[in-house]
Structure formats: structure tokens, C-alpha cells
């Protein structure tokens, strides 16, 4: 059974934690898109791990993890990450595999990424990791794939600098390469997690273009990255926070006003640790955007949701969420494609009573305070999708499941 896990907002929703939580019952975990621009923070057994390329299931010693076909991989960043894991007691040898169709990020791509963004009229706010350039080279048919490394004839097409860089990693990368379609066929009777990067609202086609990532962060990307067809995806789990965040430029219709709502902004940012794992940049924060969340559910055929960071609201008297946009006097519940409309959108807010109780002590859904359950049930009713998993803290155990995505029940 294959369960895809995607971000249902603008990234940083807590996908890594949810994948880590579910990975215990999976045979394998496949990261299907993105590169070292992504960042997952996982807290397990009192230790904090920051992952950028390696799938979140790596912390389970018996699990196999795969870097899928839709990824763009910086070999230097990958092996630095693997060495860091090893230094922290995580034995990864023989458990990490790379799709032979994955593309490689070269050092010169990083500077090219920064240069391109600086020349834009409206800069995107790239991480400068070379990801956009790698995907651009891929679409122009000029990229280098893992499969190319074993062919000496290919080397004549590369620059001297590229050859020198790749020579340092070729043998190790080739030893880890696999045919993803064959691997997934062998795993057809097993439970497999397909792990996304960034979020649905950053997808190149269905996100807030042009302020998007270059890869496929939508559910469809799971098929491409894992080397399987759409019918092979059994469940799609969308992860979202109890509020909205975004890194870099682009519209965030429910963003807190840093002047009139500075206290609320600082509280959410600091209590929620809303600083980028990859860049360290403070994330922009705002109310939960139900218009965007419902759109993400529909465009990705999300079958269930996982709610994270619910505990960040523990001390608030009142909680608000956006249920519609006011765009030049017109009220709409539909998420527009136009960036111009999104930048004009003012949130129409619905108020909810706060629960004023620490949620970390809650062991299951029934023990949540009534006001917390009401907040969740309103989200379910608005989006038309059930919340199957709730996270009330950073540790693995601060998570409880109402319905297991792997049981196949709708």
C-alpha cells in the first residue's frame, strides 16, 4: 500500500515529523521531489535532527529509504548530511538508495540560482542551493543524471570543473543507485510512504506562480518521483499547521500585520520556532487560511489531513481562521490563480474560543479540550476532509492518530 504525504500549505508544515511518526509501520520511505532547499526537523528520543535530502524514515534502523526520480541531488550536501547522521549514531550504510533518474546539482548552479533571482523584477527569494537551476537544466535536456555517472563517454560532454566535482562522488553514488520502478514493484505488497517536499501551494503548476518551487510538490509528483502510475497511490495525506507560514516572497493573504499585530506575530513565530531549517530565515506567519487549504485538498485529491502545531495556540483566548477573501469588495471562497488578486485579498475571519489548556498532556482525540475539538471539526467541515492525525508537540510521542492512513478505510 502506498501513502503519499504532502504539505498542504507553503511548506514547513511538519511533514518530516508526520513521516517519521508513520515510518514505524512502513517497509520503505521514498522522498519523491525537491532538493537540499527543503528542511525537515525531527525530534526523536530527545535528539533533534535536521534533514534536507535524506527521507525522514532514516531514523528507524531497519528501514530502507529512497531518494526518488523527481529529486535534484547535491552530492556534497548529501554526503555531509549522511556523515552528520552517522556522527549522531544513525547507521545509514546499505539503507539509502538513489534513483538512477534523479538529477545532480552542480556547484555552479548555486551562483546561477542567486544571479537569476537577483535579476528578476520580482525576486522569488531563492535559498541559493542551485535547485531552480538544476530543474531548469533538466527541462532543457542539459542536466546530468545519476545514471550518467557510470558511462565514460558522457564525461567528454562535461566541463573540467564538473568532471572534477563528480569524480569525488561518482563511485559512492553509483553504489547507491537503483531503478525506482523495479524497487516499487518489489515493494508492491508492502507499506510504502512517499514523502513530499515544500508544499502544495509552492507547486510549479498549482501553486502561487511565479512564487513557487521548481519541482512537483503536489500529489502527482509522488507518481513521477516513485516511478509508479496514479492508480498505485492508495491514500494522500495532507499535512497542515494550525496557522499559516511562508518563507521568502509571494502572497500570504492571511499574514499578520507586523505593526498592528506584532505581539501575535512574535508569539506564533517564537513559540512555533518559525525559522527556516535550511536558511535560518524567520518565516512569515498568519491565520490559518481555509480557502487555500480547501483548494489544496481538492487539487491534490487529499484523502485525509494531519494537523500540526495545534499546541502553539494553547494560551490564546481567541483563535481566528480565514474562511473567505475580500477582493476589491467581492467576497469569494475560491482560491484565485491571479497573483494580483491574491495580493489584494483581505481575509474574512471566523473566531473560535481558545482552550487555554496545555495540549501536550493529551493522549488521544477524546482527551482534547472541547474548544480544540470544535476548531478541528470546523476545519473538517469546511474542507470536506477528515483530520486523521493531530500533533501537539515536537516529540514523536506528542502525536496521536484518529485513523491510520495505512488501514485503507475512507
Go through the PLM ranges and name each one.
Residues 1-410:
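Non-transmembrane, aqueous-exposed alpha-helical and coiled segments at domain scale
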Amino acid at each position: 500500500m502506498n501513502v503519499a504525504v504532502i504539505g498542504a500549505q507553503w511548506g514547513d508544515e511538519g511533514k518530516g515529523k508526520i513521516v517519521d511518526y508513520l515510518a514505524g509501520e512502513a517497509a520503505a520511505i521514498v522522498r519523491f521531489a525537491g532538493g537540499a532547499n527543503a528542511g525537515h526537523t525531527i525530534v526523536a528520543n530527545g535528539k533533534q535532527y535536521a534533514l534536507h535530502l535524506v527521507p525522514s524514515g532514516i531514523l528507524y534502523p531497519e528501514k530502507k529509504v529512497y531518494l526518488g526520480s523527481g529529486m535534484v541531488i547535491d552530492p556534497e550536501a548529501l554526503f555531509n548530511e549522511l556523515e552528520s547522521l552517522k556522527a549522531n549514531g544513525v547507521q545509514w550504510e546499505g539503507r539509502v538508495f538513489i534513483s538512477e533518474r534523479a538529477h545532480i546539482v552542480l556547484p555552479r548552479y548555486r551562483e546561477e540560482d542567486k544571479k537569476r533571482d537577483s535579476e528578476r523584477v520580482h525576486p522569488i527569494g531563492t535559498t541559493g542551493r542551485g535547485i531552480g537551476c538544476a530543474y531548469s537544466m533538466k527541462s532543457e535536456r542539459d542536466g546530468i543524471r545519476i545514471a550518467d555517472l557510470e558511462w565514460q563517454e558522457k564525461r567528454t560532454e562535461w566541463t573540467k570543473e564538473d568532471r572534477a566535482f563528480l569524480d569525488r562522488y561518482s563511485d559512492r553514488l553509483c553504489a547507491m543507485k537503483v531503478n525506482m520502478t523495479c524497487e516499487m514493484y518489489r515493494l508492491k505488497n508492502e507499506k510504502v510512504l512517499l514523502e513530499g517536499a515544500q508544499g502544495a501551494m509552492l507547486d510549479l503548476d498549482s501553486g502561487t506562480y511565479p512564487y513557487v518551487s521548481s519541482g512537483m510538490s503536489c500529489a502527482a509528483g509522488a507518481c513521477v518521483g516513485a516511478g509508479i502510475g496514479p492508480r498505485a497511490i492508495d491514500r494522500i495525506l495532507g499535512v497542515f499547521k494550525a496557522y499559516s507560514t511562508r518563507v521568502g516572497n509571494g502572497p500570504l493573504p492571511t499574514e499578520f500585520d507586523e505593526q498592528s499585530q506584532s505581539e501575535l506575530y512574535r508569539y506564533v513565530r517564537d513559540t512555533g520556532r518559525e525559522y527556516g531549517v535550511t536558511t535560518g530565515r524567520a518565516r512569515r506567519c498568519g491565520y490559518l487560511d481555509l480557502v487555500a487549504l480547501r483548494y489544496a485538498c481538492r487539487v491534490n485529491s487529499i484523502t485525509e489531513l494531519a494537523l500540526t502545531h495545534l499546541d502553539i495556540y494553547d494560551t490564546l483566548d481567541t483563535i481566528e481562521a480565514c474562511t473567505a477573501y475580500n477582493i476589491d469588495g467581492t467576497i469569494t471562497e475560491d482560491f484565485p490563480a491571479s497573483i494580483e488578486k491574491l495580493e489584494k485579498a483581505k481575509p474574512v475571519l471566523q473566531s473560535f474560543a481558545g482552550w487555554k489548556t496545555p495540549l501536550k498532556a493529551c493522549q488521544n482525540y477524546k482527551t482534547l479540550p472541547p474548544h480544540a475539538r470544535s476548531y478541528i471539526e470546523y476545519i473538517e467541515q469546511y474542507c470536506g476532509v477528515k483530520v486523521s492525525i493531530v500533533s501537539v508537540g515536537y516529540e514523536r510521542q506528542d502525536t496521536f492518530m484518529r485513523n491510520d492512513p495505512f488501514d485503507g478505510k475512507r
